[in-house]
């Protein structure tokens, strides 16, 4: 092969490597939200964490994970202190500053949790009239009728744990949370027997990995999405989903 052709091939290879090579690890921030991502005995765990970690491992990308309260996650990203946010909702207002990986990590279902000692059935929005509903700061609820309704009052709590604690102490009437996340947290806190939820959802959404809008990360977003789609076709992905399907199957099961 002529020298010139060898030089062209070498240059192309170097460019390809530069796409994913980084001088430092990819910095990803997230808020603990079991079973999707959380810390257990000092180790990062969770369905979406394991999915993302496996995909990034296959792509040869080293990652530095950091847990922060959700509003601080958004601030760290805005100030350039993070390269990505794990498990974020994709909304139009974020598109300008965030590059969303096209393939979603998980689909979620927001429901209203209640105390078994004081149930509030929910079928329609008017059922919530004059109630106080616990919400999470910085979270987006994509059902506009629920989000904008003035039929009920909202009260933010500093954490998901605090929200459920307020619910069992009757400081709020209902708490909105993802169905699976709420069940996992209730089991973890030993509140599973005291809480239940209305099966009618107040909305559904998807969780994504969002990256900074820089040249190198744009290519990474495309490769991550393609590799995630491949992973979803494998038996390992099916086993992972089954392991986190119910609170008792995952590492964050109720404490003794």
Model regions: which residues?
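Extracytoplasmic small-molecule ligand-binding "clamshell" domains
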Residues: 24-97, 135, 156, 243
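Extended ligand-binding regions for polar small-molecule ligands
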Residues: 50-58, 117, 139, 210-244
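Short beta-strand-to-loop elements that line the ligand-binding cleft
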Residues: 62-69, 152-166, 197-199
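Short helices/loops that flank or line small-molecule/ion binding pockets
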Residues: 71-83, 100, 127, 148, ...
């Amino acid at each position: 092969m002529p020298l010139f052709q060898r030089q062209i091939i070498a240059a192309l290879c170097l460019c390809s490597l530069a796409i994913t090579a980084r001088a430092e690890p990819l910095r990803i921030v997230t808020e603990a939200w079991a079973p999707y991502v959380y810390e257990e005995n000092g180790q990062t765990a969770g369905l979406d964490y394991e999915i993302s970690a496996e995909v990034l491992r296959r792509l040869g990308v080293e990652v530095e994970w950091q847990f922060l309260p959700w509003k601080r996650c958004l601030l760290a990203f805005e100030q350039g202190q993070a390269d990505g946010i794990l498990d974020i909702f994709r909304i139009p207002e974020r598109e300008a500053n965030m590059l969303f990986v096209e393939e979603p990590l998980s689909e979620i279902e927001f429901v209203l949790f209640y105390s078994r000692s004081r149930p509030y059935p929910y079928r329609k929005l008017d059922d919530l009239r004059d109630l106080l509903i616990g919400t999470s700061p910085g979270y987006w609820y994509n059902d506009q009728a629920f989000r904008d309704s003035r039929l009920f009052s909202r009260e933010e709590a500093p954490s998901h744990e605090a929200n459920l604690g307020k619910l069992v102490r009757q400081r709020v009437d209902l708490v909105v949370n993802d169905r699976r996340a709420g069940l996992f947290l209730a089991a973890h806190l030993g509140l599973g027997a005291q809480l239940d939820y209305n099966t009618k959802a107040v909305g559904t959404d998807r969780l994504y990995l969002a990256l900074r809008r820089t040249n190198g990360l744009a290519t990474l977003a495309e490769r991550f999405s393609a590799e995630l789609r491949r992973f979803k076709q494998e038996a390992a992905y099916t086993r992972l989903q089954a392991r986190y399907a119910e609170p008792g199957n995952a590492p964050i099961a109720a404490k003794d």
